[in-house]
């Protein structure tokens, strides 16, 4: 089977809307590139950019979504985008991200691609927790700012013995980190079957019991999410999805939230939503190149 690989550079301010558009369109897969090693950086070029890069993958027969993507970009970005595309085989599709994916440390964790585990695990420094991750077709390599922000904070939360909910788990990287930090029970859910498969694979590759880390297909309305009590809810999801589900988020039985996936331009709007609908207050904020981490607590 062949796929259409579309390589895009778009303004960062429309990235949130673009990912929401891709989710609603049900594209085969996509990911955002943080560091593009194919493009040399000039010595005086800033790392922080007003643009962001995506790779989008469409099944060969999915010509409709390619047209929709072009229309979306023309309407929302005008002429301020760059697009190129090529045909690739299934093996290339599944292997494409490996070129950009090497072991690296974030806070208390070292993220290690599963294909490099034999060497990387043995060289992980003492006190650093190794996370073996193969994202497959799901979001969550750890390179993206939103994932880095959450991982950087998780090591400070004292998760031992806690019950953790991870909504929009993607590759399962955050759930794996929670389990390896001592959480007693984690429920990881995603509406994308690719995410469910990837998270399950990564759970098993890290030798985490299914009794500790349960992976299911679903969203905020998944019954166990609303029925059970949680010590922490993690949601690394775009602002549009968080906004659409704010009432369901408010009804989750937890007092502690960790949100990422919100761009700086939407931060105040999201905080206003949390204040009015969820209740409570922000206890920790951190920004990384235009993306926001928001830790939120409400009284028990």
Write out the residue ranges for each language-model feature.
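SAM-dependent Rossmann-like transferase core, predominantly class I methyltransferases
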Residues: 90-159
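S-adenosylmethionine
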Residues: 191-295
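A structural motif
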Residues: 27-28, 183, 254
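Conserved SAM/SAH cofactor-binding pocket of Class I
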Residues: 137, 141-219
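A structural alpha-helix within SAM-dependent methyltransferase catalytic domains
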Residues: 23, 151, 176-179, 246, ...
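N-terminal auxiliary segments of SAM/dcSAM-dependent transferases
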Residues: 3-121
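Active-site beta-strand termini and strand-to-loop segments that position acidic
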Residues: 106, 296-299
């Amino acid at each position: 089977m062949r796929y259409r690989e579309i390589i895009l550079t778009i303004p960062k301010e429309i990235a949130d809307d673009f990912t929401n558009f891709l989710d609603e369109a049900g594209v085969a897969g996509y990911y955002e590139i943080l560091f593009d090693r194919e493009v040399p950086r000039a010595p005086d070029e800033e790392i922080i950019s007003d643009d962001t890069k995506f790779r989008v993958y469409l099944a060969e027969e999915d010509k409709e979504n390619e047209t929709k993507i072009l229309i979306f970009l023309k309407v929302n970005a005008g002429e301020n985008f760059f697009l190129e595309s090529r045909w690739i085989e299934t093996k290339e599709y599944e292997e494409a991200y490996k070129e950009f994916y090497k072991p690296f440390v974030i806070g208390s964790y070292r993220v290690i691609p599963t294909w490099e585990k034999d060497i990387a695990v043995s060289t992980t420094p003492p006190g650093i927790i190794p996370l073996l991750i193969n994202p497959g077709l799901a979001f969550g390599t750890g390179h993206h700012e939103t994932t880095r922000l959450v991982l950087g904070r998780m090591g400070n939360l004292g998760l031992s013995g806690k019950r953790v909910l991870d909504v929009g788990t993607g590759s399962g990287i955050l759930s794996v980190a929670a389990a390896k930090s001592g959480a007693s029970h984690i429920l990881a859910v995603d509406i994308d079957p690719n995410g469910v498969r990837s998270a399950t694979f990564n759970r098993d590759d890290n030798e985490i019991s299914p009794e500790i880390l349960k992976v299911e297909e679903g969203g905020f309305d998944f019954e166990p999410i609303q029925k059970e009590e949680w010590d922490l809810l993690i949601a690394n999801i775009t602002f549009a999805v968080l906004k659409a589900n704010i009432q369901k988020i408010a009804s989750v039985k937890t007092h502690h939230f960790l949100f990422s996936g919100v761009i700086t331009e939407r931060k105040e709007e999201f905080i206003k939503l949390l204040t009015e609908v969820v209740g409570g207050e922000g206890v920790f904020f951190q920004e990384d190149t235009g993306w926001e981490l928001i830790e939120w607590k409400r009284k028990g």
